[in-house]
A protein has these predicted regions:
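Non-catalytic alpha-helical scaffolds and adjoining flexible linkers that form interface surfaces
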Residues: 1-147
Length: 147
């Protein structure tokens, strides 16, 4: 069964010579694991769309235990995040929190929007990282129902 959805790549793990396993936060499926075959090859159509912190349009096929990425189209890449170590560390921390909270589909949309807004703020350096960290933690825990 094929599913078309948007999503943010939270985590990527290299598997084999040219494959990656991605953890993707989607608004309608929640947090999913997907295998992107050949995505590490420079000439692959999946190369740029499956990068870390890439917001993309995915076409996924469901497998037994996880999904497979059939196609992906980049919607937004947060290039400014990698400009500083502090920004990269904060973005990784936020992605880890989002993956651990594993929101169900109704709440996943709000978590995704919050994370995308925070990644944009880190990328454009609108606020100090310490302030963004506090804002994200408070809002993410509130959306998850802990506060």
């Amino acid at each position: 069964m094929q599913v078309a959805t948007t999503g943010l790549v939270l985590r990527q793990v290299k598997v084999g010579e040219a494959d990656r396993i991605l953890t993707i936060l989607t608004p309608d499926l929640g947090v999913v694991s997907a295998s992107a075959r050949g995505s590490l090859r420079m000439k692959s159509a999946l190369f740029s769309a499956t990068g870390l912190f890439c917001y993309s349009e995915f076409t996924l096929t469901s497998g037994r235990s996880h999904y497979f990425v059939d196609a992906a189209q980049v919607k937004k890449v947060f290039h400014g995040i990698s400009a500083s170590i502090e920004g990269m560390a904060l973005a990784s921390y936020m992605a880890e929190i989002a993956a651990e909270l594993s929101p169900a589909p109704p709440e996943a949309d709000a978590q995704l929007r919050l994370l995308l807004n925070c990644l944009y703020m880190i990328s454009e350096r609108h606020y100090p990282c310490a302030q963004l960290k506090a804002i994200y933690e408070l809002r993410a825990l509130t959306l998850a129902g802990y506060i």
